[in-house]
């Protein structure tokens, strides 16, 4: 681990850089007064007025007026978010009136695409561009939460509730793979494969989502699951500005699994299971309360920016501390980043530097504590002083029955993660050739983390081992280089953009771990791991590993625009990766898309209410290489020892089959869409239809031995399709001086189908997936012609007079052979929807976001395991059991009875704020806000929460170790100096 002093030194250096960049304002010769108005002659508050080429400037006040000193030869640059920038010569005037044209909805908005940008009007692929104000307000431990419910076809789920260390699950246009990675490629400030947890959500400037194959094909073997391009706040010219954002958040449990209380537990046993009265004790214990706390978090972000057109900077410092709902579960972050832009040699050379430092410390939650708290006997006490071997905790010896308080108290787990990143983009503007520039981008990122776990003598499942210690270290170094040659120009009615590029990425990682047990005392925990007796007895374990991979790509793109009417984009990429087999090291990835702006045709020239109407179609091929290194190679492992020449010598044998034909998963996608804006850009409409076919799916298949060494081979066989539609409607129903209402609705539908799973050469007997511990069986099947995530099981017909389940086609013993199981549901929703609204009245603002999932099924493991009398006794059962009409059944069987509708409607976010604008020299703006998140869920699902994991091959299954979500209330403050 890098020592804390190193971090302190780096932070100090960054601060010195920042303050050295703060130059004095230029002293001018003449006072200029003016007013900045919009198209309705209403004043614009907070517009920037800057003397071009200097840091001298001003901000318009509450009446749109400004004061600035300038020479007659100076040019004023007037800009405001959402409006087109205007440049105005000072001349001999001392009083100016400047009008800005609204630009936030017009078609010249810049959209970031792969290795470049374009405008909305020229876009031919399926790309969604979100600016800062379009994203979710509130507080997030992960910036991905800002996108939840904002992009049609993009599902962002947090299946781990209020755990501050958890990741979001991200799916774009369905599941495309059986075993490779399913998440989109994340690119942050040009760094491909970056971890979105390593940026502060308050520093996000924009997020662009490349959804279809024609847009993502420029990224080759990494584009199958889509691409999310994140741009953080950049250096800007202007007077030095300091901004502080602070947030305080408290959470309360919204929905959770509720077991019987102590009194209910006693009553049920006495009335229905009197033979189990020996399990009734004298306590009244709320186990959930014993292991939880009120989650509280606070986040602080300080940013400093300013400079001139030749040299500008933006630097931010962020600190976050978040406590989870479970005790001893927390996350702490310290982040610093700076962006510097520099123009040299009379604009021949532009430099863009980024430096990032992130330190994270977190204590993960216990995955079993919530399940143990739910099932634990509520009449059992927490502590028992008569059992010193258990550390004074109450203990009943039974299989998988452990005191949840002891689980979280007698475990010390802490992870530390340090990330250091630096990159520079150098752009050579070859001015003799208009529109030609050469860009070179170099980045280096280093990640290192250490995990230390210690389980004391009294940890319930390890009593008798005398403590157990575990240490793991990991380090990864990632180097990227990218070189592109760009040319753009306009020749009359013809506009072209051409791109040629090369990219290289090398990743190298090392890891080591060790485990030991049998310590005399717990005081040293992991810091004297060698003293455990398991080491001297030969029972301790240790391992180490190193890996690397190399990725190379060549690419090109040509974009053509004729008369702003007919659009064409074509790209081609050739990728090579060390992960592929010797026979398939390289692959081609082409794409083409076209667009037709119909509103430019003569037959629509008189239709004034249509601002833009564009048809587009695209086809693109992408790949997925998100699988482990060395899968194509025959790996070796130790096989035993033999005695030779007076010493024991290790022998080695193959550990896996080689596959020289291993290659990427291939996705071919066809997309057609319509973009339309109307009524002076106050209403916009985007519709997409897509069909994507992913072939060469990777999976472990059964092979004969011989000729293979082992009977499984990781290879490319299967095929899956995803077909769907997406609709986005955005509008501004009201837009006056005092009142504005912006609204956005998204609707998505996707249908998944496994077209091919096996062939004549490769078969697989493990087509059963979705293991349920409660059911003690696999609940899903991989069957050609059906969707992934499809549940199979017996059909439930009801209960008989004895309260036993009656199943269709059951045998005399009540069972149904698996060969007779039928399709009983599918985990994937039929449609997902979201509706976001923002209202602004004078200086007040109010926003809310609703999100819905319609259709799809979920396996209610809680009901199957704990809503019957077979579980009661030593363990508790669900309080939902009390609402049943039949109280006598003591058996349960997996069937359609436990497959429930997963539809829901959630109110994700409500934010209310007020903004003050000041004309003082100290404070420019102050904003206070209150936000509530995860407010309510309307659903017919009888379990805890219908929003469960949908990725992987076991979607739609509620976990018995569910970490509850919380409703969060946040007070926020933003001050701009």
Region locations from a protein language model:
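Extracytoplasmic gating/loop element in the C-terminal half of outer-membrane beta-barrel translocons
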Residues: 405, 536, 577, 851-935, ...
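Short, small/polar-rich motifs associated with maturation and membrane association
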Residues: 2-345, 349-352, 356-358, 421, ...
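Outer-membrane beta-barrel transmembrane domain signature of Gram-negative proteins
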Residues: 276-305, 456, 462-565, 619, ...
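Flexible loop and strand-edge segments within Gram-negative outer membrane beta-barrel domains
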Residues: 253-255, 280-281, 285, 291, ...
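Small-side-chain secondary-structure face that scaffolds active or pore-lining regions
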Residues: 309, 324-335, 352-358, 364-370, ...
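Surface-exposed loop/turn segments flanking beta-strands in extracellular/periplasmic regions
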Residues: 262-283, 370-406, 453-469, 510-541, ...
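Conserved small-residue
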Residues: 243-280, 513-515, 715, 732-827, ...
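Outer-membrane beta-barrel transmembrane strand signature
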Residues: 279-320, 388-431, 533-557, 561, ...
């Amino acid at each position: 681990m890098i020592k804390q002093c190193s971090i302190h030194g780096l932070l100090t250096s960054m601060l010195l850089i920042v303050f050295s960049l703060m130059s004095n304002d230029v002293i001018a010769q003449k006072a200029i007064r003016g007013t900045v108005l919009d198209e309705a002659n209403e004043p614009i508050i907070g517009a920037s007025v800057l003397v071009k080429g200097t840091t001298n400037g001003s901000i318009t006040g509450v009446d749109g007026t400004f004061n600035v000193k300038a020479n007659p030869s100076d040019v004023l640059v007037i800009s405001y978010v959402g409006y087109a920038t205007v440049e105005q010569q000072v001349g001999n005037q001392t009083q100016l009136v400047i009008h800005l044209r609204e630009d936030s909805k017009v078609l010249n908005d810049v959209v970031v695409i792969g290795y470049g940008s374009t405008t909305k009007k020229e876009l031919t692929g399926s790309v969604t561009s979100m600016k800062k104000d379009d994203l979710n307000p509130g507080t997030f431990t992960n910036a991905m939460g800002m996108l939840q419910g904002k992009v049609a076809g993009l599902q962002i789920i947090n299946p781990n509730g209020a755990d501050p260390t958890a990741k979001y699950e991200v799916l774009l246009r369905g599941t495309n793979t059986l075993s490779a990675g399913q998440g989109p490629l994340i690119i942050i400030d040009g760094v491909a494969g970056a971890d979105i947890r390593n940026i502060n959500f308050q520093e996000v400037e924009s997020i662009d989502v490349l959804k279809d194959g024609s847009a993502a094909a420029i990224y080759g073997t990494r584009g199958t699951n889509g691409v999310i391009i994140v741009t953080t706040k950049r250096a800007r010219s202007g007077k030095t500005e300091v901004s502080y954002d602070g947030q305080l958040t408290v959470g309360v449990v919204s929905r959770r699994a509720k077991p019987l209380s102590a009194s209910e537990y006693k009553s049920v046993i006495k009335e229905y299971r009197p033979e189990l009265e020996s399990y009734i004790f004298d306590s009244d214990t709320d186990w959930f309360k014993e292991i939880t706390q009120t989650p509280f978090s606070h986040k602080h972000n300080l940013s400093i920016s300013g400079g001139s057109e030749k040299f500008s900077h933006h630097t931010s410092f962020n600190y976050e501390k978040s406590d989870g709902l479970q005790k001893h579960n927390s996350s702490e972050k310290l982040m610093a980043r700076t962006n510097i832009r520099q123009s040299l040699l009379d604009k021949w050379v532009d430099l863009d530097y980024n430096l990032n430092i992130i330190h994270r410390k977190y204590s993960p939650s216990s995955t079993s504590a919530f399940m143990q708290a739910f099932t634990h006997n509520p009449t059992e006490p927490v502590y028992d002083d008569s059992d010193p071997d258990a550390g004074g905790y109450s203990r009943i010896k039974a299989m998988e029955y452990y005191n949840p308080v002891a689980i979280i108290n007698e475990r010390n787990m802490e992870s530390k993660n340090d990330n250091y990143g630096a990159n520079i983009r150098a752009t050579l503007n070859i001015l003799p050739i208009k529109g030609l520039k050469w860009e070179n981008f170099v980045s280096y990122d280093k990640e290192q983390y250490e995990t230390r776990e210690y389980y004391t003598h009294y940890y319930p499942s390890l009593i008798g081992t005398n403590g157990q210690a575990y240490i793991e270290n990991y380090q990864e170094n990632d180097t990227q280089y990218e070189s592109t040659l760009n040319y753009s120009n306009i020749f009359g009615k013809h506009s072209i953009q051409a791109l040629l590029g090369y990219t290289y990425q090398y990743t190298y990682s090392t890891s080591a771990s060790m485990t030991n047990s049998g310590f005399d005392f717990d005081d040293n925990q992991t810091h004297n791991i060698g003293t455990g007796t398991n080491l001297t007895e030969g029972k301790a374990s240790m391992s180490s590993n190193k890996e690397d991979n190399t990725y190379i790509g060549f690419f090109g793109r040509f974009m053509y625009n004729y008369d702003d009417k007919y659009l064409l984009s074509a790209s081609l990429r050739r990728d090579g990766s060390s992960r592929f087999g010797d026979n398939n090291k390289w692959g081609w990835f082409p794409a083409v898309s076209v667009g037709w702006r119909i509103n430019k045709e003569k037959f629509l020239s008189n239709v004034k209410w249509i601002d833009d109407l564009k048809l587009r179609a695209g086809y693109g091929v992408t790949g997925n290489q998100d699988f482990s290194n060395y899968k194509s190679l025959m790996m070796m492992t130790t096989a035993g020892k033999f005695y030779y020449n007076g010493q024991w010598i290790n022998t080695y044998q193959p550990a896996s089959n080689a596959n020289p034909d291993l290659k990427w998963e291939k996705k071919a996608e066809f997309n057609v869409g319509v973009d339309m804006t109307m009524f002076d850009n106050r209403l916009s409409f985007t519709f997409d239809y897509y069909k994507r076919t992913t072939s060469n799916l990777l999976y472990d298949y059964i092979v004969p031995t011989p000729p293979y060494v082992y009977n499984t081979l990781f290879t490319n066989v299967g095929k899956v399709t995803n077909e769907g539609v997406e609709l986005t409607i955005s509008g501004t129903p009201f837009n006056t001086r005092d009142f504005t209402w912006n609204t956005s609705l998204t609707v998505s539908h996707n249908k998944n189908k496994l077209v091919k799973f096996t062939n004549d050469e490769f078969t697989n007997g493990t087509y059963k997936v979705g293991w349920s511990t409660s059911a003690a069986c696999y609940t899903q099947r991989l069957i050609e012609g059906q969707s992934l995530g499809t549940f199979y099981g017996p059909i439930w017909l009801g209960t008989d007079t004895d309260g036993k389940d009656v199943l269709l086609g059951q045998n005399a013993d009540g069972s149904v052979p698996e060969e007779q199981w039928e399709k009983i549901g599918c985990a994937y929703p039929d449609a997902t929807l979201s509706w976001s609204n923002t209202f602004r009245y004078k200086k007040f603002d109010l926003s809310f976001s609703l999100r819905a999932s319609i259709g799809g099924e979920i396996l209610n493991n809680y009901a199957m395991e704990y809503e019957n009398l077979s579980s009661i006794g030593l363990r508790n059962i669900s309080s939902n059991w009390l609402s049943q009409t039949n109280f006598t059944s003591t058996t349960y069987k997996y069937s359609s009875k436990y497959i429930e509708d997963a539809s829901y409607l959630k109110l994700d976010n409500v934010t209310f704020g007020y903004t003050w604008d000041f004309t003082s020299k100290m404070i420019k703006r102050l904003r206070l806000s209150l936000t509530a998140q995860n407010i309510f869920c309307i659903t017919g699902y009888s379990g805890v929460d219908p929003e469960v994991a949908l990725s992987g091959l076991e979607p739609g299954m509620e976990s018995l170790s569910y970490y509850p979500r919380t409703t969060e209330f946040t007070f926020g403050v933003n001050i701009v100096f």
